[in-house]
């Protein structure tokens, strides 16, 4: 199977996993990116079986609405049973790097609200140590240079992602050359830098379940 077929397989597996737990009042948290898009497409076939969704980005909200799935603001929702999203990297503890699509802050907020965070990815995303994929950091624009200097002190090589503004109006620094042995600790250190909104490490709140698309089918890993 090619990469898109693997993504379709894990997206369908996620729908199959959550459907038995949904009812007419259920609201599903939905992530951002190519794998999440496959999940939206698969979920849309069952839109009569749940109430609606909370989107982690404007792009996701647009795709959900195009499928006729109601989109709710998170502030109007008391709880989310599930949040389903992809990842740029995952280790075996289901600590993740996310944010390749620049939606990391809203993704992290929705994940924090959800009872169960299901990550869907193809097998290439599972790594022994995080950091080969550059770590995205969302930054208040005026703090870009200050934050970059602090990230260098932490051992990284930050690169400004030109031409990209997040849905929150901020910029992204992609931090290269990090070997992330202690994801929770590094997540906290980067978030403590003045001017940082958040970073793409999902370690303090990792995924609960990883559905991994492989040539031999979908494998399930639990935290």
Curated annotation (Swiss-Prot):
Pfam families: Rib_5-P_isom_A. Homodimer. Gene3D superfamilies: 3.30.70.260, 3.40.50.1360. It catalyses: aldehydo-D-ribose 5-phosphate = D-ribulose 5-phosphate. Catalyzes the reversible conversion of ribose-5-phosphate to ribulose 5-phosphate. Belongs to the ribose 5-phosphate isomerase family. Pathway: Carbohydrate degradation; pentose phosphate pathway; D-ribose 5-phosphate from D-ribulose 5-phosphate (non-oxidative stage): step 1/1. GO terms for biological process: D-ribose metabolic process; pentose-phosphate shunt, non-oxidative branch. The keyword Isomerase applies. Keywords: Isomerase. NCBIfam families: PRK00702.1, rpiA. This is Ribose-5-phosphate isomerase A. One of its GO terms (cellular component) is cytosol. Its EC number is 5.3.1.6. The keyword Isomerase applies. GO terms for molecular function: ribose-5-phosphate isomerase activity. The active site is at 107 (proton acceptor). It is an enzyme of class 5 (isomerase). Substrate binds at residues 32-35, 85-88, 98-101, 125.
């Amino acid at each position: 199977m090619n990469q898109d077929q693997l993504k379709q397989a894990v997206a369908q597996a996620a729908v199959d996993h959550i459907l038995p737990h949904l009812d007419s009042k259920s609201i599903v948290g939905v992530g951002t990116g190519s794998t999440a898009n496959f999940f939206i497409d698969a979920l849309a076939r069952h839109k009569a079986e749940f109430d609606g969704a909370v989107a982690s980005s404007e792009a996701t909200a647009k795709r959900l609405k195009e499928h006729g799935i109601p989109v709710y603001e998170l502030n109007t929702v008391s709880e989310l049973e599930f949040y389903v999203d992809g990842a740029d990297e995952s280790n075996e503890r289901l600590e993740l790097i996310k944010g390749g699509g620049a939606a990391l802050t809203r993704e992290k907020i929705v994940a924090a609200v959800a009872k169960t965070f299901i990550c869907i990815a193809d097998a290439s995303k599972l790594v022994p140590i995080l950091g080969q994929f550059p770590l995205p950091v969302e930054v208040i624009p005026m703090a870009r240079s200050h934050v970059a200097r602090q990230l260098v002190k932490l051992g990284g090589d930050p690169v400004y992602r030109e031409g990209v503004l997040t849905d929150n109006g901020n910029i992204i620094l992609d931090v290269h050359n990090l070997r992330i042995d202690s994801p929770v600790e590094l997540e906290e250190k980067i978030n403590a830098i003045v001017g940082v909104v958040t970073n793409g490490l999902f370690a303090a709140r990792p995924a609960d379940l990883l559905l991994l698309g492989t040539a031999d089918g979908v494998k399930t890993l639990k935290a």
